[in-house]
Amino acid sequence: MRLVIARCSVTYEGRLNAHLPTATRLLMVKADGSVLVHSDGGSYKPLNWMSPPATLHVEEPSPDQADQGVTQVWRVQAKKSDDRLIVLIEEVLADDSHELGVDPGLVKDGVEADLQRLLAEQISLLGDGHTLVRREYMTAIGPVDILARDADGGTVAVELKRRGDIDGVEQLTRYLELMNRDPLLAPVRGVFAAQQIKPQARTLAEDRGIRCVTLDYDAMRGVDDAESRLF
């Protein structure tokens, strides 16, 4: 993991074009090849990023760029598309690298882990014709609980929660934004699945085109014991 704090401007070129004017930002370079650009406020998600697989090249600035104060140019090129992230760095305030090793991954509580296993085994609960691709589909910003295909072969990303709230919807939204950049996956539809979904979360999800599914944990386990139900 490399962490660079720098004054820089950032341009994303590809299926979506976006530009961030010069400001002090955190540049995160991960071992999987992803590069993420963060600010110190506004949101906990990156302002822009390049998902793996990608290649980072550091270059000297052109004479015109140097005249404008640029000291180095980062070009992050996606390997599966023409998308690229261009970072023009004017000043590096900090540059640290750390070896983090292999991460064991997110450990869910017992019910959420069981819900994931059960839904993977009973994927038809999402609708007729759905098939499981895999559990814990890894992205540059974290694992999607379940990746599936619908009856038409479309990609479906499922976020599972014991109790579904707005944070869960925001999390799934970030995954969808990232995954829909991948031509091998897009278009990707989202499903927010939980034992109980708060009204505000349902409203936000539906506004963003995310389908909500309420799961009956006892029925999925083949249990119908009123005394042991959580809700």
Curated annotation (Swiss-Prot):
The keyword Ribosomal protein does not apply. Keywords: Cytoplasm, DNA-binding, Endonuclease, Hydrolase, Nuclease. It holds the Pfam family NucS_N. It is an enzyme of class 3 (hydrolase). Gene3D superfamilies: 2.70.180.20, 3.40.1350.10. Coiled coil: none annotated. HAMAP family: NucS. Belongs to the NucS endonuclease family. Cleaves both 3' and 5' ssDNA extremities of branched DNA structures. This is Endonuclease NucS. It comes from Micrococcus luteus (strain ATCC 4698 / DSM 20030 / JCM 1464 / CCM 169 / CCUG 5858 / IAM 1056 / NBRC 3333 / NCIMB 9278 / NCTC 2665 / VKM Ac-2230).
